[in-house]
Amino acid sequence: MPLSNAQLAQTIDHTLLAPDASDAQIRELCRQAAEHRFYSVCVNSANVPLAARELAETGVLVCAVVGFPLGAGLSAAKAFEATAAIAAGAGEIDMVINLGALKSGRADDVKADIDAVHRACGTVPLKVILETGLLTDDEKVRVCEMCRDLGVAFVKTSTGFGHGGATLADVALMRRTVGPTLGVKASGGVRDRAAALAMLEAGATRLGTSSGVAIVTDQGGGAAGY
């Protein structure tokens, strides 16, 4: 059965992660999210307080990114950022893994990094960003297995700032690896309705995009960037 606009909107994290995003742009993001009933807005942690105020009483969540976009900070810093973002009003957290540790074969350190943020989140859902464009398929599977074992809420393809974005092949691989219990978030390059529906068909359950309005109104090409 085809998804209605309302159902499609509930798969979307309406996203603005530009480092120079102004207060006015964050307010407009939130206005659009409330109007179209998106699942959440996804913003940098410094913008969480404003977004939380703008979205109070709307039912739209605020999602904050942590260790973004490089993932190369200390685990303690990532955990602190997650805790502070939640205290400021974030209802979900998207973290970037330690890619250097993964590439160096330090799988235990990668898992410990994820676990530190997961613990800091408590009951708040955690999405773990793999940055799939930089990983081999074996590395993607390894991180997905870690996330499955730790019981995080979602695995996520990309930051939208690195090399490449979400691909159908990566979404399908991630879904096969984590099974039916974890969410899969496709992000980076999902800019129109056809791409969004294809990602959902491949196994995604959430979409990170700056083109949410274009997707749900079927206006064709969406915002450049994320």
From Swiss-Prot:
It comes from the Bacteria. The active site is at D94, K156, K185. Keywords: Cytoplasm, Lyase, Schiff base. Its main location: cytoplasm. SMART domains: DeoC. One of its GO terms (biological process) is 2-deoxyribose 1-phosphate catabolic process. The keyword Cytoplasm applies. It catalyses: 2-deoxy-D-ribose 5-phosphate = D-glyceraldehyde 3-phosphate + acetaldehyde. GO terms for molecular function: deoxyribose-phosphate aldolase activity. GO terms for cellular component: cytoplasm. It is found in: Cytoplasm. It holds the Pfam family DeoC. Pathway: Carbohydrate degradation; 2-deoxy-D-ribose 1-phosphate degradation; D-glyceraldehyde 3-phosphate and acetaldehyde from 2-deoxy-alpha-D-ribose 1-phosphate: step 2/2. Its EC number is 4.1.2.4. PANTHER family: DEOXYRIBOSE-PHOSPHATE ALDOLASE. Belongs to the DeoC/FbaB aldolase family. DeoC type 1 subfamily. Catalyzes a reversible aldol reaction between acetaldehyde and D-glyceraldehyde 3-phosphate to generate 2-deoxy-D-ribose 5-phosphate. This is Deoxyribose-phosphate aldolase. The gene is deoC.
